[in-house]
């Protein structure tokens, strides 16, 4: 089996990992670097039950369990730990001090943390970039090969894939897996695939200089100008705190390296953080960043065979749950490619055939 994976984010790395566990030595083609986009700039929260009642329930539950198994089996440290998660509210326009004791000690008295959303039984976290890199490194140790280059086409012969064009050269393949996050939309010019969109989000990483308890916080926060944001705060075991908020629908640039924060978005997020926590108001900021999360038209991932082209597969569109669902996606894709069926997760809800293929003439990108 000659397999080529297009994309070295968390989904591509996870597919490579599980393929190598079955004896396949895939080639992973990446034009920028491992975890260069959302896989390296997301929060890394894991929740076992938060997709319950949706078509992603089985995928999320199994993937949560796989995360624990992978962390237990590996000698590498990618920041996996169980966390307690809370929900609350706050406003930049009020100085009201809540008389009840907040369960989180590092937030301002003006923040009302009134709900526990998850416990160490069902919520956890990883450092996304470290996890993705570790999965890729494990795959490489079993024979996978990472090549830096730009995929420019998928070659076909007699209704099946025959290879991938990379910077003008052909890599022969029996299986081609598109796992390029929101840039998977580029593959609609080569294969009959539905559209994948990018939802932009902004984030900060603070260096607090002290260990913060494993407590994740989800807020509804009213800015001084009246806008309502939903910032998320994830302390990490390395002494940093990751915070994200402020989404936008700005167009996806054609190259991942061209992604940059929207004007004013980082400053707004810094003001929110200063209002929420004195620890953040005085902490150094070690990363100011933005990324695009991949989303399909109906909000569900695209995982499965590309219709009408034998040997072509896609795995993308996981939205905010890409880190959570990567292990189960990687395992299921390896089963689908090698066994033609999956054992633990039913991929029917994510079949690309449920959505109409995109007309390549409609492809549009932002600057870069």
Predicted regions, residues:
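N-terminal Rossmann-like FAD-binding beta1-loop-alpha1 element of flavoenzymes
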Residues: 2-27
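Conserved Rossmann-like nucleotide-cofactor binding loop
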Residues: 11, 34, 183
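Active-site substrate-recognition segment that forms the wall
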Residues: 17-18, 44-46, 78-82, 180-308
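Conserved FAD-binding subdomain of flavin-dependent enzymes
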Residues: 18-21, 31-85, 93-101, 224
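Short loop/edge segments at beta-strand edges and connector loops
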Residues: 30, 148-150, 287
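Flavin (FAD/FMN) cofactor-binding and adjacent substrate-gating region
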Residues: 69-149, 153-160, 295
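Predominantly flavin-linked oxidoreductase catalytic cores and closely associated redox partners
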Residues: 127-213
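C-terminal catalytic lobe of FAD-dependent flavoproteins
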Residues: 277-368
């Amino acid at each position: 089996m000659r397999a080529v994976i297009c994309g070295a984010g968390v989904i591509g790395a996870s597919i490579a990992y599980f393929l190598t566990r079955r004896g396949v030595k895939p080639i992973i083609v990446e034009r920028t670097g491992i975890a260069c986009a959302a896989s390296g700039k997301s929060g890394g929260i894991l929740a076992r039950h938060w997709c319950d009642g949706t078509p992603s329930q089985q995928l999320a539950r199994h993937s949560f369990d796989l995360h624990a198994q992978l962390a237990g089996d590996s000698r590498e440290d990618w920041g996996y730990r169980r966390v307690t998660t809370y929900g609350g509210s706050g406003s930049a326009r009020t100085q009201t001090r809540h008389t009840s004791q907040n369960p989180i000690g590092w937030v301002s008295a003006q923040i009302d943390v009134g709900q526990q959303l998850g416990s160490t039984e069902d919520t956890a976290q990883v450092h996304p970039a470290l996890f993705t890199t570790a999965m890729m490194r494990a795959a490489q140790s079993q024979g996978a090969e990472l090549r830096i280059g730009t995929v420019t086409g998928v070659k076909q012969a007699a209704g099946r894939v025959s290879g991938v064009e990379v910077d003008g050269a052909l890599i022969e393949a029996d299986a081609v897996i598109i796992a390029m996050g929101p840039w998977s939309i580029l593959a609609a010019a080569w294969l009959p695939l539905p559209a994948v969109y990018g939802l932009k989000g902004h984030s900060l990483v603070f260096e607090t200089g002290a260990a913060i308890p494993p407590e994740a916080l989800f807020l509804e926060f009213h800015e001084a100008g009246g806008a309502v944001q939903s910032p998320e705060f994830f302390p990490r075991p390395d002494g940093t705190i990751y915070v994200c908020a402020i989404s936008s629908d700005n167009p996806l640039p054609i190259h991942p390296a061209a992604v940059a924060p929207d004007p004013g978005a980082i400053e707004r997020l810094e003001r929110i953080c200063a209002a929420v926590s004195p620890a953040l108001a005085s902490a150094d900021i070690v990363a100011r960043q933005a990324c695009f999360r991949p989303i399909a038209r109906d909000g569900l991932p695209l995982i499965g065979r590309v219709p009408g082209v034998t040997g072509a597969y896609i795995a993308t569109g996981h939205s905010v749950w890409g880190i959570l669902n990567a292990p189960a996606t990687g395992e299921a894709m390896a089963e689908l490619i090698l066994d033609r069926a999956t054992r633990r997760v039913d991929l029917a809800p994510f079949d690309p055939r449920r959505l109409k293929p995109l007309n390549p003439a409609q492809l549009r990108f932002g600057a870069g």
